[in-house]
Amino acid sequence: MKVFSTVLLAIVACCAVAEAKTFGKCELAKALANNGIAKASLPDWVCLVQNESAFSTSATNKNKNGSTDYGIFQINNKYWCDSGYGSNDCKIACKNLLNDDITDDIKCAKLIHKRHGFNAWYGWKNHCNGKKLPNVSSCF
């Protein structure tokens, strides 16, 4: 039984890793553009993601206030996604922000941006605002 449990755990771990993805700069820029993000703002979005999650869909971060940030955009569970903790304004389970399909992540990030602009993200405020942004023009 112990061997079976170990094998099962290994299979589950492989599957969980298979769902996670680290995007490249251009791959992310194209995904954002294909989901309605204006090309003029792509450098800001790419910079945000680079500094929030290092382009990883599986990124999580526990905050001092007890909340958690999820996924490539580091979307917080106190307001935006459902983990049994907060208001879930994006109407999405936080765990769905950790897979390699970022369509729903982008939809939620657009809502956050609509309400608060890029200032909703400390990664953008601290590393992108007023600074040299990534060039994504060669991606298209």
Curated annotation (Swiss-Prot):
UniProt record, GO biological process: defense response to bacterium; killing of cells of another organism
Q: What does the entry state regarding organ or tissue expression?
A: Expressed in salivary glands and Malpighian tubules.
Cystine residue pairs: C26-C139, C47-C128, C81-C94, C90-C108
Give induction info. By bacterial infection, expression significantly increases 6-12 hours post challenge with bacteria.
Give GO terms: molecular function aspect only: lysozyme activity
Is the keyword Ion transport assigned to this protein? no
Indicate the segments forming the C-type lysozyme domain, all copies.
21-140
The record's InterPro entries line, in alphabetical order, gives: Glyco_hydro_22 (IPR001916), Glyco_hydro_22_CS (IPR019799), Glyco_hydro_22_lys (IPR000974), Lysozyme-like_dom_sf (IPR023346)
* Chemical reaction(s) catalysed: Hydrolysis of (1->4)-beta-linkages between N-acetylmuramic acid and N-acetyl-D-glucosamine residues in a peptidoglycan and between N-acetyl-D-glucosamine residues in chitodextrins
Is Disulfide bond set as a keyword in this record? yes
The catalytic activity of this protein is classed by the Enzyme Commission as: 3.2.1.17
Q: Where is the signal peptide?
A: 1-20
What the entry lists under SMART domains is as follows: LYZ1
Instruction: Recite the UniProt keywords alphabetically.
Output: Antimicrobial, Bacteriolytic enzyme, Disulfide bond, Glycosidase, Hydrolase, Signal
Location of the active site: E52, D69
PROSITE patterns recorded:
GLYCOSYL_HYDROL_F22_1, GLYCOSYL_HYDROL_F22_2
Q: Name one Pfam family in it.
A: Lys
According to its UniProt entry, what is the function of this protein? Lysozymes have primarily a bacteriolytic function; those in tissues and body fluids are associated with the monocyte-macrophage system and enhance the activity of immunoagents.
What protein family does this chain belong to?
Belongs to the glycosyl hydrolase 22 family.
Q: What is this protein called?
A: Lysozyme c-1
The species is Anopheles gambiae
